[in-house]
């Protein structure tokens, strides 16, 4: 069997952290806490060792993209419009995609003070629950067929070509698209697109979301760790929903601790694990960079495409 990482440069954490530059911006513990997702663990040292070198790498790709746009303009003998630098971030549920995305957004804003840095999640392109019910696929929520891929691809195409667009907003508290609420994306310099499906496209195999990406990241971890983090997150969500009857997870607070754990394990085994093994993990080698997390959520290995 061909080694999946044959086209990647594998870099240890100790080697990677040497790419940090002393004059780079950093963050305070309070700022990190404000962007941290449930049960995710990140500290200032992780930012310095992993994410500041990553910002250096993104700067290289960004500069190369600008140079290519300029050179194309000379070749075509016409001015080329500025296009947003789009970063795709993928990985399993509970692996820390959202924290990584918000962290990169903050660091990019510090690194490029005059730039507009927006972030979207592909959750907003899930079909509303009623549509999933009508299609008979509510139990497949999060799988490729549960996303409005034409809408998602049209969004990327519009933004890449300088247009403004309003997109749906998803709420984990109500477990559905929020009726009447949209997020406006208007000519950002950087756009971070985060979701489990950013390297997939089940509708039109001739066009992938990744065709619009200038840089892409896959957050990786051993399955046993992802399962543990998922179960921990589920318990945290229940605690947060205990006094909020409008929260989707409130209904599960009526269960005993053992019943709730059993439900979470069943959901992991029948939905999230299947989705990871069949649809998410097989796309990771489409990423430009793979960040592997160890037991303690720390990045311990980096794979960079050659």
UniProtKB/Swiss-Prot annotation:
Keywords: ATP-binding, Coenzyme A biosynthesis, Cytoplasm, Kinase, Nucleotide-binding, Transferase
Compartments reported by the entry: Cytoplasm
GO biological process, one term: coenzyme A biosynthetic process
Pathway noted in the entry: Cofactor biosynthesis; coenzyme A biosynthesis; CoA from (R)-pantothenate: step 1/5
Catalytic reactions on record: (R)-pantothenate + ATP = (R)-4'-phosphopantothenate + ADP + H(+)
E.C. designation(s): 2.7.1.33
Acyltransferase in keyword set: no
CDD domains: PanK
EC top class, as a word: transferase
Residue sites binding ATP per the record: 91-98
GO cellular component terms listed in the entry, alphabetical order: cytoplasm
Main location: cytoplasm
A molecular function (GO) term: pantothenate kinase activity
InterPro entries reported in the protein's UniProt record: P-loop_NTPase, PanK, PRK/URK
Family statement: Belongs to the prokaryotic pantothenate kinase family.
Name of this chain's protein: Pantothenate kinase
Gene transcribed to yield this protein: coaA
